[in-house]
């Protein structure tokens, strides 16, 4: 599915207000890790994989995805999700949406795919912050973060990932820990438990009276240096 989404086209739809992901962190980041799988737009390769799995245009794979109509950090969820839905259809994946309110979606994310609130969904689309190793990777890949402990909605994890996480947690020098986290990130991208759609760039409108604002690569803004004329 990661091969089916034309992210350049999506960026055009959003007026340039997104960055194209190659994983949870970008190439050049200390946690990048140089994964073997390249997240890209390659419909022919995706169709080949789907055909090998027994699917076709006349026999598509059907899946339900829980999404929200609005909400914190969701960018433009309805047009974006509909764009992805159309993209996946070219790769023999027929997506049905279960559209729910943002706070309900966020709660469902915590209780997991096996809960009745999932309403039979096979996936959930929730934006997330990647500000530290736990938020970025661990909570989605550890067998110790299965619901309701944390946000491993799809119960993804195994002994290999638990070992990679333990290696990072038990390494206390910065370079060694970054190397361990890079190995974890590389394996996450290679196993692809997510479809990486977009990095939010946090567009905002500011009054000319506001000074010393620094745009972070995050949703979280440091207001301490900001002044107003």
PLM ranges: what are they?
Residues 1, 65, 88, 109, ...:
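Hydrophobic, well-ordered secondary-structure elements that form the walls
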Residues 4, 140, 187:
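Conserved catalytic core of Hanks-type protein kinase domains
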Residues 89-146, 180:
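Periplasmic binding protein-like
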Residues 32, 71-75, 104-106, 129-133, ...:
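Flexible loop/turn segments at secondary-structure boundaries
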Residues 12-15, 53-72, 116-126, 171-208:
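Bilobed periplasmic-binding protein-like "clamshell/Venus-flytrap" ligand-binding domains
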Residues 30-45, 55-61, 110-117, 138-166, ...:
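Short, solvent-exposed loop/beta-turn-alpha elements that line the ligand-binding surface or hinge
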Residues 2-86, 90-91, 155-160, 176, ...:
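Append "and occasionally in soluble cytosolic enzymes with long acidic Gly/Pro-rich linkers
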Residues 27-28, 102-103, 202:
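Conserved beta-strand edge residues that scaffold enzyme active sites
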């Amino acid at each position: 599915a990661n091969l089916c989404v034309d992210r350049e086209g999506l960026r055009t739809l959003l007026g340039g207000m997104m960055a194209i992901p190659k994983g949870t962190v970008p190439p050049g980041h200390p946690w990048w890790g140089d994964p073997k799988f390249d997240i890209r737009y390659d419909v022919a390769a995706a169709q080949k994989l789907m055909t090998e799995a027994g699917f076709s245009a006349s026999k598509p794979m059907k899946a339900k995805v829980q999404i929200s109509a609005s909400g914190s950090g969701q960018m433009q969820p309805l047009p974006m999700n509909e764009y992805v839905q159309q993209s996946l259809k070219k790769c023999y994946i027929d997506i049905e949406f279960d559209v729910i309110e943002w706070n309900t979606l966020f709660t469902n994310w915590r209780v997991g795919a096996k809960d009745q609130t999932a309403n039979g969904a096979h996936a959930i689309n929730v934006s997330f912050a990647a500000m530290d190793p736990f938020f970025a990777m661990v909570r989605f890949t550890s067998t110790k973060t299965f619901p309701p402990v944390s946000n491993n909605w799809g119960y993804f994890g195994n002994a290999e990932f638990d070992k990679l996480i333990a290696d990072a947690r038990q390494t206390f020098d910065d370079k060694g820990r970054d190397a361990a986290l890079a190995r974890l990130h590389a394996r996450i991208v290679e196993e692809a438990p997510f479809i990486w759609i977009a990095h939010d760039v946090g567009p905002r409108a500011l009054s000319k009276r506001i000074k010393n604002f620094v745009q972070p690569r995050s949703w979280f803004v440091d207001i301490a240096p900001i002044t107003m004329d």
